[in-house]
């Protein structure tokens, strides 16, 4: 049975956004609000009793130049593993959009997305980060880490703007965090999984092979990208909203030198920030979890207000149930583009897929979409089981859902 998240209370925040360079600043408005719903529990539910994990600042990071946008220290949340998972490590890269110009990076540095001064001192560990076997059957007793995201460039930039007092040091944050975790035991890991959601899911794809090289040859190392398959596709006006955004990020934050050279040897740097141009070249096993009708991409790169001045897409972008037949056909075309983007990638036995026909975004950290009694399924397999089967080589997993509206197990996000 489909479960809808009725989110009318945040519609105003989603619709009212500042515009910069001709498109909505969705990187600090809409995506934040979508990802703030990541836990998948009602706080008033009797079952809402998640593990709370404290923030650790990386004390040696400053001397390495590894700092947030505002110059504060980066951080992570670590919950130690035990028993059979004591020597296994799961690193979750936080998502949260991007900043592509001075104006919205200055705005961002006054939030948890750009400064550890504003980060929560404790956060909930749910879904793939849960410490309960009944909620997270394969990874509950691993060392589980959530690396906070405060650089605005998917852990890939290395530059600065002195006039605006902005530090774009995502690549150095990544390295400093890995060094710190290695010193805390990760260097001896028998098993490791790098995962991430949204902008963190993109970072997984960018950093996966580098992550593999941190370990000895006998360590099982794989990567999981959740809602990170951002497509280089035109918006409803024929414009290039997301390409313009990514070009700004790459240029402003000095990302070029930190992109995979196999890609930049034949494509421009902005193209090499798009996962579709990277995934087939990766050497490390990768699992992709993505909604075929990714709600962030619908709202912010396919049909943002800047590409829809007449408001024709307004109702559809907030509630798929209000889309016209023509709009649904357009979204089916987007799904087809996504499937074409993973066609070569899926031919490799080492890789895995879970692409469900839902209007969702980030399904691995939400408890209700990761593993629960009514979780989304494809061929009766929930996301958690699919990922576990793939990681532990219990089965080859290439799960692609039938087109909307066939899947009644979706937990669709509805904003009105």
From Swiss-Prot:
GO biological-process terms attached to the record: cell wall organization
Annotated glycan sites: 27
EC number per UniProt: 3.1.1.-
Disruption phenotype: No visible phenotype under normal growth conditions.
Enzyme class: hydrolase
Swiss-Prot/TrEMBL keywords: Cell wall, Cell wall biogenesis/degradation, Glycoprotein, Hydrolase, Secreted, Signal
GO cellular component, one term: extracellular region
Endpoints of the signal sequence: 1-20
GO molecular function, a single term: hydrolase activity
Subcellular location: Secreted, Cell wall
Main location: secreted
Pfam families: PAE (PF03283)
Active-site residues, as the UniProt record annotates them: 198 (charge relay system), 294 (charge relay system), 361 (charge relay system)
Function: Hydrolyzes acetyl esters in homogalacturonan regions of pectin. In type I primary cell wall, galacturonic acid residues of pectin can be acetylated at the O-2 and O-3 positions. Decreasing the degree of acetylation of pectin gels in vitro alters their physical properties.
PANTHER family from the UniProt entry: NOTUM-RELATED, PECTIN ACETYLESTERASE 10
Family: Belongs to the pectinacetylesterase family.
Name of protein: Pectin acetylesterase 10
Taxonomic lineage of the native organism: Eukaryota, Viridiplantae, Streptophyta, Embryophyta, Tracheophyta
């Amino acid at each position: 049975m489909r479960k809808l998240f009725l989110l009318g209370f945040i519609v105003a925040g989603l619709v009212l956004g500042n515009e910069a360079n001709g498109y909505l600043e969705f990187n600090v408005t809409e995506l934040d609000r979508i990802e703030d719903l990541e836990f998948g529990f009602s706080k008033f539910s009797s079952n809402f009793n998640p593990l709370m994990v404290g923030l650790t600042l990386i004390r040696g990071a400053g001397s390495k130049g590894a700092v947030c946008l505002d110059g504060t220290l980066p951080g992570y949340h670590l919950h130690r593993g035990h028993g059979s998972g004591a020597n296994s490590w799961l690193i979750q890269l936080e998502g949260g959009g991007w900043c592509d110009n001075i104006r919205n990076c200055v705005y961002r540095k006054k939030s948890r997305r750009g400064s550890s001064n504003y980060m929560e001192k404790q956060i909930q560990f749910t879904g793939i980060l849960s410490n309960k076997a009944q909620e997270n059957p394969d990874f509950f007793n691993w060392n589980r880490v959530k690396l906070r995201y405060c650089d605005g460039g998917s852990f890939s930039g290395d530059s600065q703007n002195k006039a605006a007092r902005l530090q774009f040091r995502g690549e150095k944050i990544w390295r400093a965090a890995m060094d710190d975790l290695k010193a805390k035991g990760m260097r001896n890991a028998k098993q490791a999984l790098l995962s991430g959601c949204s902008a963190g899911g993109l970072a997984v794809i960018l950093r996966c092979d580098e992550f593999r090289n941190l370990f000895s040859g006998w360590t099982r190392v794989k990567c999981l990208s959740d809602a990170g398959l951002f497509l280089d596709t035109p918006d409803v006006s024929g414009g290039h909203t997301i390409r313009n955004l990514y070009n700004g990020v790459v240029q402003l934050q000095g990302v070029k030198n930190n992109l995979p050279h196999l890609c930049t040897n034949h494509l421009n740097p902005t193209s090499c920030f798009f996962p579709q141009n990277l995934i087939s070249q990766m050497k490390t096993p990768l699992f992709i979890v993505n909604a075929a009708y990714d709600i962030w991409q619908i709202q912010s790169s396919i049909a943002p207000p800047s590409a829809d001045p007449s408001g024709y897409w307004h109702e559809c972008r907030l509630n798929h149930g209000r889309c016209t037949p023509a709009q649904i056909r357009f979204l089916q075309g987007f799904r087809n583009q996504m499937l074409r983007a993973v066609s070569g990638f899926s031919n490799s036995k080492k890789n895995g897929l879970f692409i469900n026909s839902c209007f969702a975004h980030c399904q691995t950290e939400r408890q209700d979409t990761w593993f629960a009694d009514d979780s989304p399924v494809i061929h009766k397999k929930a996301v958690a089981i699919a990922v576990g089967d793939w990681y532990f080589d219990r089965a080859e997993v290439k799960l692609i859902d039938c087109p909307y509206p066939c899947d009644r197990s979706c937990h669709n996000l509805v904003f009105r």
